[in-house]
A protein has these predicted regions:
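Acidic, metal/ion-coordinating pockets
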Residues: 1-133, 139, 177-182
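Non-catalytic terminal accessory segments
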Residues: 32, 119-120, 131-182
Length: 182
């Protein structure tokens, strides 16, 4: 629901933003009618945990109330937005977030009952991505370098000049006037 305040109005002009829990709950009967029993919700809303990246002894924020309002048929909720990492149980459901910018990978393990096809257990673990220790992919590196060469004449040309001071202090979306210019 907070998206219109975080992005350019032009980017969301034709979109509707509805209550997250009501929207999910309205779709559950349709999923059930199609035989779906294991339901995982991906939502761009999050929480503010305490603890390390694989726990959350005390979590607050919008996601807590949203999860509590979800239909009991929802088994797992994968969250985002707050750029915080956690693996929680909220109202008897697994709720996860994998931090920000690919710094963590969340592995979710669901066990399904073969007869009912419903989730009988769910657990997750966040793993730190140690990208500095990984070897570069030669083919991918060559592709990136070829586009860098193609873009260089344009990228190296000044697009304008600014005489005012631009703030680098980010807003709630993580954007700043200086960042927008760059």
């Amino acid at each position: 629901k907070g998206t219109p305040g975080l992005v350019s109005p032009d980017g969301v002009a034709d979109l509707e933003f509805r209550d997250e829990a009501e929207t999910v709950n309205a779709l559950v009967p349709e999923l059930k009618a199609r035989g779906v029993e294991a339901i995982v919700v991906l939502i761009h809303e999050g929480g503010l945990p305490t603890g390390d990246y694989n726990e959350c002894p005390d979590i607050s924020g919008p996601i807590v109330d949203i999860v509590k309002k979800l239909d009991r048929a929802v088994d797992v909720v994968v969250t985002g937005h707050t750029h915080r990492a956690y693996v929680c149980e909220i109202d008897g459901r697994l709720v996860t977030s994998g931090d920000k910018y690919g710094t963590l990978v969340t592995a979710i393990d669901l066990r399904l009952d073969r007869a009912s096809r419903d989730v009988i257990s769910a657990r997750a673990s966040n793993t730190i991505v140690r990208s500095a220790t990984l070897a570069k992919n030669a083919e991918q590196t060559a592709l990136i370098e070829s586009y860098d060469r193609l873009a260089a004449p344009i990228a190296d040309r000044p697009a304008g000049a600014v005489t005012a001071t631009l703030s680098r202090v980010p807003n709630t979306a993580g954007e700043s006037p200086l960042g927008d210019i760059i």
